[in-house]
Curated annotation (Swiss-Prot):
Family the UniProt entry places it in: Belongs to the bacterial ribosomal protein bL28 family.
UniProt source species: Metamycoplasma arthritidis (strain 158L3-1)
Signal peptide span: none
Record bears the keyword ATP-binding: no
Keywords in alphabetical order: Ribonucleoprotein, Ribosomal protein
PANTHER family: 50S RIBOSOMAL PROTEIN L28 (PTHR39080), LARGE RIBOSOMAL SUBUNIT PROTEIN BL28A (PTHR39080:SF1)
Chain intervals for the UniProt region annotation (Disordered): 1-21
GO molecular function: structural constituent of ribosome
Cellular component, GO, one term: ribonucleoprotein complex
Protein's name according to its UniProt entry: Large ribosomal subunit protein bL28
Superkingdom in the source lineage: Bacteria
Biological process (GO), any one: translation
Length: 65
């Protein structure tokens, strides 16, 4: 599920896939994006696509609806 984190702007990384013979081919490390409903300051709800790490942080801060 490629894309960007709507909270921090984090995006996928690129790197190399290494075979047993140490041949290299380009690959991407995609983000683990999850849909999270967040309570805004004015009391409304908004759905964001954030990484699993940021979803845990939002839940810890009590901002998840």
């Amino acid at each position: 599920m490629p894309g960007r984190d709507q909270l921090t702007g984090q995006k996928a990384l690129s790197g190399n896939k290494r075979s047993h013979a140490l041949n290299t081919t380009k690959r991407t490390f995609d983000l683990n994006l999850q849909k999270v409903t967040v309570l805004q300051e004015n009391g409304t709800k908004k759905t964001l696509r954030v990484t699993a790490k940021n979803a845990r942080t939002l839940k810890k801060l009590g901002l998840v609806a």
